[in-house]
Amino acid sequence: MRFEGTSAYVATADLKIAVNAAIALERPLLVKGEPGTGKTVLAIEIAKALSAPLIEWHVKSTTKALQGLYEYDAVTRLRDGQLGDARVKDIRNYIKRGKLWEAFVADERPVLLIDEIDKADIEFPNDLLQELDRMEFFVYETGETIQAGRRPIVVITSNNEKELPDAFLRRCFFHYIRFPDSDTMRAIVEVHFPGIKHRLVAEALKLFYEIRDVPGMKKKPSTSELLDWLKLLMVEDVSAETLRERDPKRLIPPLHGALIKNEQDVHLFERLAFMARRDGR
């Protein structure tokens, strides 16, 4: 069971090594990187490549670790008891399985995605340590222990919004997805847009990386935003020549709303354009 990428996902050699090492060690794969570098999609593509079921747990700021195990609805049970509902005799009717429970009892070895773990509070990773390490947990309401028949392949993503605890990090295999270089990005583009004109890609990538390198950019455009921009360029029939011969005093590229998503960055480019016009007089 090895991951070699898929036809829809360009995986670097380092990323393939990281995925396969985590699988071999039976450790969670902790993936960090800029937003839009394919961290979440990685879990989806691992599941596709290995023909494994995918279970997704998208973490929010209000998410608690126990929700990944199960949730007990005591309020509904109390109400049903007052109404004389026969279901109250079996407490299992009021227990909702969480994503870890689903992964532990899956018929086939699944890929479990715990997405954006750093959005939750600082104690969230520590609260999952034992369950992820031992692959079991206890349900207090029923007195049963849920054990994983086979360890799921766990992929955990983080955008570095918070530092993760050392004890949690020790139990993971870590990989940082670097922002793609020009050659890798060209391969990604060709996967999404087969047959796209090479000259358009070349000019678009040149402009894209120039924008990312502008000092003071608050939000640099991501891979997904580049793909959106290229799609618009093709729909609007913007040629490679238009990108190459653009007025250097304008600076802001055509259809820039797909790339520049922050008003401060728009103002930055407007100031740079003003300075270029002033200096060119």
Descriptions of predicted regions:
Residues 1-281:
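C-terminal regulatory/interaction module of P-loop NTP-utilizing enzymes
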